[in-house]
């Protein structure tokens, strides 16, 4: 098989044509050019800003103060499951499997 000349590459839709071996296409990963990366860096610097201010939360008409109103310990207690005062005793069921006689 002949390879295309190094100086001039044919492009289809802006990229070189697919390489086939045994009737199947072979994926070729090529690194991107550095031109687009420089443009992205400029855009990132322009749009860098701090996070937007947090909106004030009103609970029953009063401004909430975050952890001061609801400490983390109180939230943990609210999410814990209540424990049973007495243990449940499950009676074991015997499984009877019907099998044919010999």
From Swiss-Prot:
Entry keywords, A to Z: Acetylation, Apoptosis, Autophagy, Phosphoprotein, Translation regulation
Superkingdom assignment: Eukaryota
Post-translational modification, as annotated: Phosphorylated. Phosphorylation by MTOR inhibits the suppressive activity of DAP toward autophagy.
Pfam family, one: DAP
Biased composition (Polar residues): 92-102
Modification Phosphoserine, positions: 3, 49, 51, 91
Residue segments, region Disordered: 1-102
Modified sites of kind N6-acetyllysine: 29
InterPro entries named in the record: DAP1/DAPL1 (IPR024130)
Residue numbers carrying N-acetylserine: 2
Cysteines joined through disulfide linkages: none
GO biological process: apoptotic process; apoptotic signaling pathway; autophagy; negative regulation of autophagy; regulation of translation
Compositionally skewed regions (Basic and acidic residues) per UniProt: 32-43
Job of this protein: Ribosome-binding protein involved in ribosome hibernation, a process during which ribosomes are stabilized in an inactive state and preserved from proteasomal degradation. Acts via its association with eiF5a (EIF5A and EIF5A2) at the polypeptide exit tunnel of the ribosome, preventing mRNA translation. Involved in ribosome hibernation in the mature oocyte by preventing mRNA translation, leading to ribosome inactivation. Ribosomes, which are produced in large quantities during oogenesis, are stored and translationally repressed in the oocyte and early embryo.
Self-association state and partner proteins as the record states: Associates with ribosomes; inhibiting translation. Interacts with eiF5a (EIF5A and EIF5A2); inhibiting translation.
Family note: Belongs to the DAP-DAPL1 family.
Protein name: Death-associated protein 1
Gene name per UniProt: Dap
